[in-house]
């Protein structure tokens, strides 16, 4: 509140890392290391304090912990992460002292997406706001009022559909396509729904990089 009042800025996303095992790091060496219970409370308090802000959690947390914080308000998670230098270019060896932290959730991206679909979540790969310059006060005014959801829902479905067509396993693709059909009904703006369906069909025909960018009506 002070930052907004004094500087006109506020949090766009908040990350919730904590000390976790890594090369040469033993969490037992830290007397004030945060337990799972306290960690979950911190996530819940942040979500209540800033309900409009994206919250991020990485693969340093276990699958069980990530499942819990998704229920408490985390909105962005990673999957299939590589934490060492060049990790995405080359397979990581068993002993790699360049790792930033030990990955606790070792599932592949496809497995994470499949898991999210099973939980009824929409795995979104959207970056439309950044690419359209919908940032700063322009973004915050929409996020605080919840109006940003009118762009998020179509864009989430579009980016998910592109992922499903290009990278997903057959099981994940089947679940994802079914979820897209269901979630289309939650787009209440007829024009937005029509545009989303048009773009979804174009993606299935092999076209790429669609995003819904129309500014939201304040009515």
Which residue stretches match the model-derived regions?
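Short acidic, glycine/proline-rich loop/turn micro-motifs
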Residues: 25-29, 91
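Alpha-helix N-cap and loop-to-helix initiation/capping positions
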Residues: 30-38, 104
């Amino acid at each position: 509140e002070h930052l907004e009042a004094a500087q006109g800025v506020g949090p766009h996303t908040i990350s919730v890392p904590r000390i976790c095992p890594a090369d040469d790091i033993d969490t037992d060496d830290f007397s004030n290391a945060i337990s799972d219970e306290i960690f979950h409370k911190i996530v819940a308090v942040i979500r209540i304090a800033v309900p409009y802000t994206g919250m991020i959690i990485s693969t340093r947390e276990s699958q069980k912990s990530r499942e819990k914080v998704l229920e408490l308000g985390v909105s962005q998670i990673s999957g299939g992460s590589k934490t060492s230098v060049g990790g995405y270019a080359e397979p990581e060896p068993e002993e790699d002292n360049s790792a930033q932290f030990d990955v606790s959730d070792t599932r592949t991206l496809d497995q994470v997406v499949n898991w999210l679909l099973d939980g009824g979540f929409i795995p979104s790969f959207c970056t439309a706001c950044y690419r359209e310059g919908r940032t700063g006060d322009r973004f915050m005014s929409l996020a605080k009022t919840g109006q940003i959801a009118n762009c998020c829902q179509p864009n989430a479905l579009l980016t998910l559909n592109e992922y499903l067509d290009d990278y997903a396993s057959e099981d994940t693709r089947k679940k994802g396509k079914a979820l897209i059909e269901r979630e289309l009904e939650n787009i209440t703006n007829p024009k937005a729904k029509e545009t989303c369906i048009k773009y979804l069909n174009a993606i299935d025909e092999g076209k790429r990089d669609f995003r819904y960018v129309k500014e939201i009506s304040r009515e």
